[in-house]
Amino acid sequence: MRTIISLLLLSAMVFAVIEAISLEEGLQLFEGERGCVGENQQCADWAGLHCCSGYYCTCRYFPKCICRKDSGK
């Protein structure tokens, strides 16, 4: 009986550690995207708001620079 309880406690501790690590990695990924804007939103490559990953800032109609979807070229 003690063995079963010990195994359950050990597996619960392992699960808690794994969840804590995955949560920390998720928060680090989110911090990199903080303050970014999406498609057709106003951006500024040199300062201020930047485009989220998968988009790039184009200033075709300066001074209104906007984020466009990155085609992967």
From Swiss-Prot:
Looking at the keywords, is Signal present? yes
Q: Which residues form the propeptide?
A: 21-34
- Superkingdom of the source species: Eukaryota
Q: Which residues carry this modification: Serine amide?
A: S71
Any keyword Disulfide bond? yes
User: What function does this protein fulfil?
Assistant: Insecticidal neurotoxin that modulates the insect Nav channel (DmNaV1/tipE (para/tipE)) in a unique manner, with both the activation and inactivation processes being affected. The voltage dependence of activation is shifted toward more hyperpolarized potentials (analogous to site 4 toxins) and a non-inactivating persistent sodium current is induced (site 3-like action). Interestingly, both effects take place in a voltage-dependent manner, producing a bell-shaped curve between -80 and 0 mV.
Q: What else is known?
A: Negative results: does not affect mammalian sodium channels (Nav).
Q: What family does the Swiss-Prot or TrEMBL record give for this protein? A: Belongs to the neurotoxin 07 (Beta/delta-agtx) family. 03 (aga-4) subfamily. Aga sub-subfamily.
Please report the name of this protein according to its UniProt entry.
U3-agatoxin-Ao1k
Q: Which organism is it from?
A: Agelena orientalis
